[in-house]
Regions:
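C-terminal motif of bacterial Sec signal peptides marking the signal peptidase cleavage site
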Residues: 23-25
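Predominantly five- to eight-bladed beta-propeller fold
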Residues: 32-38, 88, 171-234, 248, ...
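Beta-strand-rich domains and repeat architectures in extracellular enzymes and scaffolds
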Residues: 52-88
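Conserved beta-propeller blade repeats
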Residues: 57-72, 107-125, 144, 151-169, ...
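Short, solvent-exposed loop/turn segments at conserved positions within beta-propeller repeat blades
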Residues: 82-87, 127-132, 207-211, 271-278, ...
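Beta-propeller blade signature
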Residues: 89-94, 136-138, 214-221, 277-286, ...
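Cap/lid segment of the alpha/beta-hydrolase catalytic domain
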Residues: 268, 450, 457-580, 587, ...
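Active-site-proximal cap/loop segments of hydrolase catalytic domains
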Residues: 522, 527-528, 535-732
Length: 732
């Protein structure tokens, strides 16, 4: 259930790309989109950050340095609220002069830029032909030329360094995997039923209809791609990259361009629902052979200089990255089967010896977004004390007598999130956010980690609005530990006044409350409406060591709930906090937290808001899809009467305490949320109303676990603040 972290994602959902960026069915080219993100005279005069102002912001991403480090290509997405869609364009920055040039206009979506090895050509995805295909253009300027011309959309791609081959991802119908009645009964073409014999009927936001993402390799000649070869297998019902996020960072060419490494979870049905066992596979172009490097027949795995044979790597293994000499493949690995939030270890596979070495055995944090600087140096991003920082790891020489790996060096510091980075030509550029700043580019000094801002995509907006400040607060918990809590203050904060205050409950549950900028749960937006926001890093979040992270499993109703209350009680002692006007809000696991706190808050709060939260543990077990998550975090199934951890979890399900509910609650859900299905919201709404509690149900018929579409987002925020204003801000 852990939400996808932006530091891990090159792209998010295909559905989001199709509907929010304006592709619709992904078969018709959208009409050109008029972009006007200038603030109105009224917005400038008010100087207030509002949902409508937020949707005028440009969203930067996709930063890629040229091979010599002298140029930086990236994307910016702008939205038209009235049209309810956005458009993405490519931009190019000259690193020496700072000059920025827009490469594509707003008549089509242009995403996922990548450089050729010589730095002369830019490849990218575009829907300008009517479907999403690979295009290329001269980096110096010129008209784009089409590289692929397939009937179906290309959902991701990569050109090898020699420039003679391209991998691409497409959704294909797998023979024998049909799940739709019209496919199974050809004489009943208007029938609409999904038919299943095993689990995983639904995943995240879609029904399994027998269509899977497959990985293809095609020859590339004179800038044109031939028909590709499906290296997964045309009759294989597996996804590459893995479902449900389909992150193309899970696929990587070797530098010689002769091999392709990728991630796959080769399971189906009940096995898929119960397991996190994905592996790294390597396809050899010359022989056509594929090898699973995580489970070789005679594999050897090295941990702390000890070699163990036949270690199966039963958890998530993802994100292969080749060393410059192609001898090694670095990847991220989780040791515990079925535990999706386990420590992300940084592993190194030796292509000569098949040995796998754990490079971060003593590092108590995740290692994400891994990149090689040279054959002996790795860089990665790690969550550390409520922030994301850039780290460097020096490796011993292959022939060194002592093969012990030193601890990584944390290069950057400060209250920010480094969400992605690109490095080339001795230069590093990072995409950085804070709770007061949407994504911008910063150059990172590799020696001392100093950040120098490069971009200012939303300067015209920041210049005309007032944002509050963010304070770091360490709160003592009930068991004597210190908990980092972010406190976001309203603009023009006056400590002599009293402010309504919100407790924010994080989702995941294993997701850090960091310096992220969110377009869904935006703390700056909440503060701009006059609320103080209290955001604790309660038990169960990463970036504070494994003990802090793992405590929550099997203890949802325990210490982390007490942590929430410690945070709000600590802030409520401040003279500027109006303890008679407190609210509590959260999504996903945070929504569960809201439901649980509604039954035990002892009249602290005047209102609750739960978005896509778990209400009834027993019905949730039969409604969700990735059962490995519940089995690990609840402890097992509700029928395991001899399992004390599971029985304790189910005994403390929020629905068991509805008789104690006494506070107005707003309940929000998405009808395409198959992780925490909307039926959980219906149960909670029914319980609240039958107990005479003021309640409101908001169900978005075209959203899933999160709300992405522009107008839906504005409605979400209007409902959110309308509820809080009525029951918290205006409380008597």
């Amino acid at each position: 259930m852990k939400k996808p972290n932006s530091a891990n994602m090159k792209k998010f959902f295909l559905l989001m790309a199709c509907t929010v960026l304006g592709l619709g069915s992904c078969t018709e080219r959208p009409q050109p989109l008029e972009i006007d993100n200038a603030l109105t005279a009224e917005e400038i005069a008010a100087g207030r950050f509002t949902p409508e102002v937020m949707w005028k912001m440009g969203r930067l991403g996709g930063s890629q340095l040229s091979p010599d480090g002298k140029r930086l290509v990236y994307t910016v997405t702008y939205y038209n609220l009235g049209e309810n869609r956005g458009v993405t364009a490519l931009y190019l920055r000259d690193m020496a002069s700072g000059e920025v040039r827009q490469l594509t206009d707003h008549t089509s979506n242009n995403t996922s830029p990548a450089w050729s090895a010589d730095g002369r050509t830019l490849y990218f995805l575009s829907d300008r032909s009517g479907t999403q295909q690979v295009w290329h253009m001269a980096a110096a300027g010129g008209e784009p030329q089409q590289v692929t011309a397939f009937d179906a959309d290309v959902e991701g791609f990569g050109v090898n360094k020699p420039g003679d081959a391209i991998w691409y991802v497409q959704t294909v119908a797998v023979p024998g995997a049909e799940k739709c009645s019209a496919d199974l009964y050809k004489d009943m073409p208007r029938s609409k039923a999904h038919i299943y014999d095993d689990l995983m009927a639904r995943h995240w936001n879609y029904w399994d209809e027998g269509r899977y993402r497959h990985l293809f390799i095609a020859a590339l000649t004179d800038g044109k791609a031939a028909e590709g070869v499906d290296i997964v297998g045309a009759d294989t019902a597996w996804d590459v990259p893995t479902a449900p996020y389909f992150d193309t960072a899970e696929i990587a060419w070797s530098n010689a361009g002769d091999r392709l490494a990728y991630t796959c979870k080769p399971l189906a049905g009940t096995d898929y629902a119960l397991s996190t066992d994905s592996d790294i596979f390597v396809y050899d172009r010359a022989s056509g052979r594929t090898v699973n490097i995580c489970k070789p027949m005679e594999g050897r795995v090295r941990f702390n200089a000890m070699v163990h044979r036949n270690t199966p790597f039963p958890g998530y293994d993802k994100y292969p990255v080749w060393s410059p000499d192609d001898r090694y493949i670095a990847f991220r690995s989780m040791a515990t089967p079925g535990y999706e939030a386990d420590k992300e270890r940084l592993m190194r596979y030796d292509c000569r010896t098949a040995e796998i070495t754990d490079l971060t055995p003593s590092f108590d944090y995740h290692a994400t977004n891994v990149a090689w600087a040279d054959d002996r140096t790795l860089w990665f991003i790690a969550p550390m004390e409520g922030t994301y920082q850039l780290c460097r790891l020096a490796l011993p020489a292959p022939d060194a007598t002592c093969g012990t790996v030193d601890l990584p060096t944390v290069v950057t510091s400060g209250d920010h999130d480094i969400n992605a980075f690109t490095m080339a030509g001795g230069r590093i550029v990072a995409e950085v956010t804070t709770m007061r700043m949407a994504t911008e580019q910063f150059e990172v000094d590799p020696a001392d980690g100093k950040l120098t801002q490069l971009s200012a995509v939303n300067k015209e907006i920041y210049d005309h609005i007032r944002l509050g400040t963010v304070e770091k607060r360490w709160v003592e918990t009930t068991d004597g530990k210190r908990m980092l809590t972010w406190v976001v203050l309203p603009p023009d904060f006056d400590p002599a006044k009293k402010y309504p205050t919100l407790l924010f409950c994080e989702g995941g549950p294993q997701s850090v409350v960091s310096q992220a900028w969110s377009y869904r749960w935006n703390f700056a937006l909440m503060a701009s409406q006059g609320y103080v926001v209290v955001a604790p890093n309660r038990r169960g979040v990463p970036s504070f060591g494994q003990e802090w992270l793992e405590q929550i499993s099997g203890d949802y109703s325990g210490q982390n709930i007490r942590d929430y209350l410690s945070a709000i009680d600590d802030v409520a002692r401040e003279p500027w906090c109006d303890r008679d006007r407190l609210g509590c809000v959260g999504a996903s696991y945070g929504g569960y937290s809201v439901y649980f706190l509604a039954g035990c808050h002892q009249k602290r709060f005047k209102a609750f808001i739960a978005h896509c939260g778990i209400f009834n543990f027993e019905s949730m077990y039969g409604q969700t899809e990735e059962l490995f998550f519940i089995n690990h975090d609840y402890g097992g199934a509700y029928w395991e009467k001899d399992n004390p951890t599971a029985m304790r979890s189910y005994a403390n399900s929020p629905h068991k305490f509805v008789d104690r509910w006494d506070t107005p609650i707003l309940i929000v859900t998405g009808e395409y949320d198959f992780r925490i299905p909307y039926t959980q919201a219906l149960e909670a709404f029914t319980a609240a109303r039958l107990h005479g509690i003021p309640a409101r149900l908001v169900a978005f018929e075209d959203e899933a676990h999160q709300v992405f579409k522009p107008q839906n987002s504005v409605v979400w925020n209007r409902e959110f603040f309308g509820w809080l204003d009525k029951y918290v801000k205006e409380a008597r």
